[in-house]
Amino acid sequence: MLLLLLPTLALPVALGFSRIGSLLAGAPVAWLVASQSFRLPLELVMHRAASDGAMPPQMTFTGSNFDIVTGATAIVVAALAAWGRAPRWLLLSWNALGTALLVVILVIAVASLPAIGAFGHQPARLNTWVAYFPYVWLPAGLVSAAVLGHVLLWRRLLQRGMRGRALSPLS
């Protein structure tokens, strides 16, 4: 399962810094932020899975995963960006928080693997559910999408000429 982590992180980072990533980073900032809103319903589904005993509780917002904040605030921050009312400091802060929360859940997921078992070795505390279909799409697709989204927004916000510049609604 640890082998899933390398492509989950390396591929979206490589794509984010490629020519295609340059094109994608040129999308309106509001779109780049809004793309992270999928994390809100995802966290609700994960909470339900934990309530049903299908995944470890530490990987939900009732445990140690507060990634739901990124999904919920993406909607508000994207709307502010679309209206031209999201100051650059807000976008930088939001992306830093979202990136940090993503790193936290990645650490929790790895620490919950059977080989590590940092949260205990009881079956309910072990992260084995992502090895089964359709849950394998969580690390393979959705985590990669979240990583790519943050890389693209960082690239956009830190590109030359954008520093210190106010963002117009469609910039």
Where are these regions (language model features)?
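C-terminal ends of transmembrane alpha-helices
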Residues: 40-53, 104-121
